[in-house]
């Protein structure tokens, strides 16, 4: 079945062979004509299966591979799916970035405990970033919310990116463009 989902203003046709993950696309479904379309065929799923944990279902592999393909078709539209936990604080998005298992969700939960209703989750795993012509970046939801299922259909301008790494002590410091570029590119 082919559905059309809105990714930061770009309608993309998404081919779903399995109904089990369709619910994640519902908040972004649109009747607009797709600007691009993606599908993960059976041969593609078989090739990709080795990159996923043993026992991963074909439906799960399709769902995750669709993420990569959607990101690829969004690039010409100045948008990309980005790996990070995005939440809104004081009107701007804080994007927590780190390899899987580092503690992005844990860090978000701590912010939520400290700031309560000032914090709104946007997407817990893979938001869409839109680099506007004017130079600012806005952050938008995607169907890929992560294993915790955190996300809602809201968007806001990017306020900052926090790179996390495990350490014995909590510290924060500003990093320069040279160091941050390498870290950023691993998040796409």
Language-model features: locations:
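Conserved lysine of the Walker
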Residues: 104
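Post-Walker A alpha-helix
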Residues: 107-108
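Short Pro/Gly-enriched beta-strand edge/turn motifs at strand-loop
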Residues: 65-71
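Phosphate-centric recognition/catalysis
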Residues: 49-55
């Amino acid at each position: 079945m082919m559905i059309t989902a809105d990714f930061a203003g770009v309608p993309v046709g998404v081919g779903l062979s399995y109904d089990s993950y369709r619910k994640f696309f519902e908040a972004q479904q649109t009747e607009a004509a797709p600007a691009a379309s993606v599908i993960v065929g059976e041969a593609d799923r078989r090739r990709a299966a080795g990159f996923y944990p043993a026992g991963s279902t074909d439906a799960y592999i399709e769902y995750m591979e669709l993420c990569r393909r959607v990101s690829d078709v969004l690039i010409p539209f100045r948008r990309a799916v980005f790996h990070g936990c995005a939440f809104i604080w004081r009107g701007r998005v804080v994007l927590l970035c780190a390899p899987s298992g580092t503690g992005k969700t844990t860090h978000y939960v701590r912010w939520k405990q400290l700031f309560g209703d000032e914090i709104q989750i946007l997407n817990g795993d893979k938001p869409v970033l839109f680099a506007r012509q004017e130079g600012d970046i806005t952050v938008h939801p995607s169907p890929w919310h992560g294993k915790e299922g955190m996300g809602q259909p809201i968007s806001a301008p990017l306020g900052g990116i926090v790179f996390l790494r495990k350490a014995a002590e909590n510290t924060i410091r500003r990093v320069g463009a040279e160091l941050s570029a390498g870290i950023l590119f691993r998040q796409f």
